[in-house]
From Swiss-Prot:
This is tRNA(Ile)-lysidine synthase. It comes from Bradyrhizobium diazoefficiens (strain JCM 10833 / BCRC 13528 / IAM 13628 / NBRC 14792 / USDA 110). The gene is tilS. GO terms for cellular component: cytoplasm. It is an enzyme of class 6 (ligase). It comes from the Bacteria. It catalyses: cytidine(34) in tRNA(Ile2) + L-lysine + ATP = lysidine(34) in tRNA(Ile2) + AMP + diphosphate + H(+). Its EC number is 6.3.4.19. The N-terminal region contains the highly conserved SGGXDS motif, predicted to be a P-loop motif involved in ATP binding. GO terms for molecular function: ATP binding; tRNA(Ile)-lysidine synthase activity. Gene3D superfamilies: HUPs. It is found in: Cytoplasm. GO terms for biological process: tRNA modification.
């Protein structure tokens, strides 16, 4: 890409942005009507026309039902998509909207609807218009929330969701360059006022970016930091894979294992680096629990309790196991974690009784 953040994107640069998607059978473009997604649609259409045989493109707009202007904006997207020779669908988020956590709920609904649209269109990928500016904002949001290394890696260029690849081809492109591209092409776009609504966290942090940029922390620097953290996170994931294989290889033949249980020899587990131990617990709890992803802070607390119990003396664990009393037993995110007989075991926890339920007949 050009080093000039205010220069329009050339046809050659657009070809590079979409190059890895050339062999896909079909692509869904998520287009809201704002400048970023309108630029995505225009650039993708121009790229497709340059190919002898490119992927089929379908434009999808999600109307969350939160603003009166959204329906008009969806119609405008459809008009422009038609001019570009692309089919368009508008999908609506129906049902009650939550009073708290609205941005997260709207985002989840949007992705669910987009994945459904991709399956209907026979598309292998959904393309979103996240930019370098979005990446910087995401890093800041996760930083102030105290996220771990995985969270601070921010958004990946390619991720899989429900069997569909979510692609962000503009992740290294500044928003200003997309706006310059649209201005040169004389293409209009919508302005979503919620992007400036300081009732939400992202707009408040967005307002801080000019001050950070004055100190050298501009979107380019923050996005570069996210990329470096993502590189480190990928390395730790490989180390965690290796640690899991190591524990399996050194385990005894009669050790309890199965699709509904993860089991580690406690002494060997304790020798691993703390971050690796934490990730092994997170993986097991998220795989076997039935109450959604575990919170990082709670898993950190669990790991500290396990470390303390193991350090207190492995000699006590066999005696406790004989008496049927685990040294440690906790539930977290729908998983049951226990330390007994010198082993850490993780399995699905029994379903919680709902208030008013009674046992027996």
């Amino acid at each position: 890409m050009s080093d000039d953040d205010n220069s329009p994107i050339s046809a050659r640069e657009a070809k590079q942005l979409f190059a890895e998607l050339k062999s896909a059978p079909a692509l869904v473009l998520a287009v809201s009507g704002g400048p970023d997604s309108i630029a995505l649609m225009w650039l993708a259409a121009r790229w497709q026309r340059s190919l002898a045989r490119g992927p089929r493109l379908t434009v999808v707009t999600v109307d969350h039902g939160l603003r009166a202007e959204a329906a008009r904006e969806a119609r405008e997207v459809k008009r422009l998509a038609t001019e570009l020779g692309l089919p368009h669908r508008t999908l609506r988020w129906r049902g009650a909207k939550p009073k708290t956590g609205l941005p997260a709920a709207a985002r989840e609904a949007r992705y669910r609807l987009l994945m459904q649209a991709a399956r209907s269109a026979g598309a292998s990928h959904v393309l979103t218009a996240h930019t370098r500016d979005d990446q910087a904002e995401t890093l800041l949001m996760r930083l102030v929330r105290g996220s771990g290394l995985a969270g601070l890696s921010a958004m990946a260029r390619l991720t899989e969701r429900d069997g569909i690849v979510l692609a962000r081809p503009l992740l290294d492109v500044p928003k200003a360059q997309l706006i310059a591209t649209l201005k040169r092409a004389k293409i209009g776009f919508a302005d979503d006022p919620t992007n400036r609504d300081t009732a939400f966290t992202r707009p408040r942090l967005r307002a801080l970016l000019p001050q950070l940029a004055a100190e050298g922390g501009d979107a380019r620097s923050l996005a570069r930091l996210a990329a470096r953290l993502a590189r480190a996170n990928a390395a730790v994931e490989v180390l965690t894979d290796g640690a899991e294989r190591f524990l399996r290889l050194r385990d005894r033949d009669d050790a309890p294992h199965g699709p509904d249980m993860r089991s580690f020899e406690a002494g060997a587990f304790a020798t691993l680096p703390e971050e690796v131990r934490l990730r092994m617990l997170l993986r097991a709890i998220n795989a076997l629990g039935h109450e959604g992803p575990a919170e990082l802070g709670k898993v950190e607390t669990l790991l500290a309790a396990l470390d303390q119990a193991i350090a207190a003396g492995m000699a006590a664990a066999p005696r406790a196991a004989v008496n049927g009393r685990p040294v440690l037993k906790q539930t977290l995110a729908g998983a049951l974690i226990s330390l007994a007989g010198g082993r850490i075991q993780i399995a699905p926890a029994p379903a919680r009784r709902r208030k008013g339920d009674r046992g027996g007949s």
